Amino acid sequence: EEVIMNPNTEIVDAIKKSIPLKYALVKNAQVIKLLPDDKNGPLHQRWIMEIENGLTITVFYNVDIAERVPIDVGSYVDVAGELEYGDRWKDPIMHWTHDDPQGQRKAGYVILNGTTYGQATGP
């Protein structure tokens, strides 16, 4: 019998223990809800993705730095970025899901249908 490994096991374990990860890669997560853009500071596109049996992460993606991701509910995405927790959010969040213009962090990204988003479009 073939055993299918969950590619998100490390992230699931971190979330269950509320451990932040400076760089995490979530693979093949389903977008379950689109949220209004976050306009506090730089403009961020936001969505909620499910990584396993009801376990969700809210994604913040800076559209001032990189082009908007053309996602819909039901889309499957790979997302790389920083995993954090906070009193302001119900779910764990992923941010820095795009290039860091200052180059101080490993570049995050979003992959949708084989296309990578999150590369810097500015100077």
For every predicted segment, state its role.
Residues E1-P123:
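OB-fold and OB-like single-stranded nucleic-acid-recognition modules
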